[in-house]
Amino acid sequence: FEYVGDRDTGAEASAAEAVKMGARGSSGREKVYYTRADLEKGVRLESPATGVSALIQAEGLNWLGLWKSFSDPAYALGVEPCNCPGLGRAAARERGLLPMLMPGETRESAVRAQFSSWRTMP
């Protein structure tokens, strides 16, 4: 990752923390990170607790939003490839991170997600 930011604090966070998948009940509240990454190469997320991994790749998108909630019973991960961090339009524009399309201009993007399991689920 080139950059990892915590949505709630606005502070930089470690890549290891952003991709860490905790066990069910390991966190009391959601965590949201926005990362700037080479999504053409992809980002792999792995959950030792469940034996599941995901490889997320994208073309034309340089940011990845990761929403994680490992509370019990809700155990969820949201993955959002995007063209800017989820700071809101005004904050992204102020930081020079909001892409703009000119009239008549087009852009294309593609997203691929590959999921695998390395152990048998009960």
Label the model's feature ranges:
Residues 1-58:
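Active-site/ligand-binding surface loops and adjacent short beta/alpha elements
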Residues 44-122:
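Active-site pocket scaffolds in enzymes
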